[in-house]
Amino acid sequence: MNMFSSLSLVTLLLLTMPIMMMSFNTYKPSNYPLYVKTAISYAFITSMIPTMMFIHSGQELIISNWHWLTIQTLKLSLSFKMDYFSMMFIPVALFVTWSIMEFSMWYMYSDPNINKFFKYLLLFLITMLILVTANNLFQLFIGWEGVGIMSFLLIGWWYGRADANTAALQAILYNRIGDIGFILAMAWFLTNLNTWDLQQIFMLNPSDSNMPLIGLALAATGKSAQFGLHPWLPSAMEGPTPVSALLHSSTMVVAGIFLLIRFYPLTENNKYIQSITLCLGAITTLFTAMCALTQNDIKKIIAFSTSSQLGLMMVTIGINQPYLAFLHICTHAFFKAMLFMCSGSIIHSLNDEQDIRKMGGLFKAMPFTTTALIVGSLALTGMPFLTGFYSKDLIIEAANTSYTNAWALLMTLIATSFTAIYSTRIIFFALLGQPRFPTLVNINENNPLLINSIKRLLIGSLFAGYIISNNIPPTTIPQMTMPYYLKTTALIVTILGFILALEISNMTKNLKYHYPSNAFKFSTLLGYFPTIMHRLAPYMNLSMSQKSASSLLDLIWLEAILPKTISLAQMKASTLVTNQKGLIKLYFLSFLITILISMILFNFHE
């Protein structure tokens, strides 16, 4: 076991080597990207040893050897939790990041700040691994905030563009809302249980834990772009493609789901939280799949598909299958990173063109990228015996056979068929048909950095699901029998999606549609969500501010109350004074007549 713990720590320490190397004489700035890529590849190979040992023995480990601080009765120590989730996730994250780093060496070649870019990516990976291996909430929070700030820096990498800055701010603001939930949960655990250690929280297992779990669900909603806090994920495509591949496919966005998986001992008997996560996940997966149907930006389609898959993971947590959700995280990382890298290869070759309507016929010019993109799309739809099938099919089978909300199940199935539609749409628009891009485009995909990185993920997309699912120890008693129609539901809805996509594609080719049609306005405008949230709220706020400034301050206080009131009082006085004509005889006579009449009346009454 000493070797197990040592190698686990060596894996984490290897990643800090490129940062420490900068203080040595042998450091050459021009080779820095190579240092980072090599360090990550070594870390991946090293991490496989403790992972194999763990699969063989099934022995969990907690490394806790540095006392950190004591607050009254709370003792915090720096501790790493090497359990099933962290031991399986570390090699997957390192393998995917290794490929993305190699891809970045090609994609960001001409960037003047490439060393800083690699530093940011490396720090991002380190904070993600801190989050995954953390054994207490405080350490987990450091990793949580780390991936948040690194995403902000990387999305806004091209800071000269207003869109990139807006997207980065949007990401950090939506994550802030989620962080409020995390901090509330931490505060609740501290005040009620006086501990932040995961073991102690699970051991005490408080019965009234709805409050912190809702906080954690809010945190997961912000970080994993669930419905309500989802708009930042498609906007984050403003960053460079390697950033999209790393942040929005395999690591950062699954942090929210990972948090809920970590807390599954508290959620497994809490039906209230399970219902919330199930319904939230089902709404997310359907809504974002609908939005993906009519997008034209290749990266935005893949971003919405990521959000849709995150909704599916949320559904899995809602039906009390955390291990299955984790399996989907691991399998999804391979083909989603590869899809982003293929789109990056196409964008780079077509002079930064992202609109799929301006592509077409790329299967001849870019055969390797085409192969990878088709395999990735099929893996995403859950094609049998590709990586996605091993988790996606199981999730839908589990949802079919569990006591679940029928509406949530129906929404998930519709979203699954939509997945097939938008995947087919990318293939038809970008790869098949006639070329619709300018003829003088210099297409070249013969760079070994590009080919090798995509090749590794392609192999992962073919075999990783089989390997990972066969190395998972069974956690609950499996369903022994199942009606064949429930077993084949996932496949049937996917095939339906493919048929529908072919039909729509045929109609589009033959110009049967009248553009713009109201039928897909909801999808094109992203469900009116940005219009309402990003336009209406600031408009109401600004108009209210304007009204209060102009009406309340100017018109009422500075005009009506002070100057106008004074002038009105003076006008009244001056009117009174000017009405005095100075006719003294007439005034005396009027007094006299009044006195005489009153005396006569007085005497008369006597």
UniProtKB/Swiss-Prot annotation:
The chain crosses the membrane at residues 4-24, 43-63, 87-107, 117-137, 140-160, 171-191, 213-233, 241-261, 273-293, 310-330, 366-386, 413-433, 457-477, 482-502, 582-602. Its EC number is 7.1.1.2. It is an enzyme of class 7 (translocase). InterPro entries: NADH_DH_su5_C, NADHpl_OxRdtase_5_subgr, ND/Mrp_TM, NU5C-like, Proton_antipo_N. Keywords: Electron transport, Formylation, Membrane, Mitochondrion, Mitochondrion inner membrane, NAD, Respiratory chain, Translocase, Transmembrane, Transmembrane helix, Transport, Ubiquinone. One of its GO terms (biological process) is mitochondrial respiratory chain complex I assembly. It is found in: Mitochondrion inner membrane. Belongs to the complex I subunit 5 family. Core subunit of the mitochondrial membrane respiratory chain NADH dehydrogenase (Complex I) which catalyzes electron transfer from NADH through the respiratory chain, using ubiquinone as an electron acceptor. Essential for the catalytic activity and assembly of complex I. Core subunit of respiratory chain NADH dehydrogenase (Complex I) which is composed of 45 different subunits. This is NADH-ubiquinone oxidoreductase chain 5. It comes from Bos taurus (Bovine).
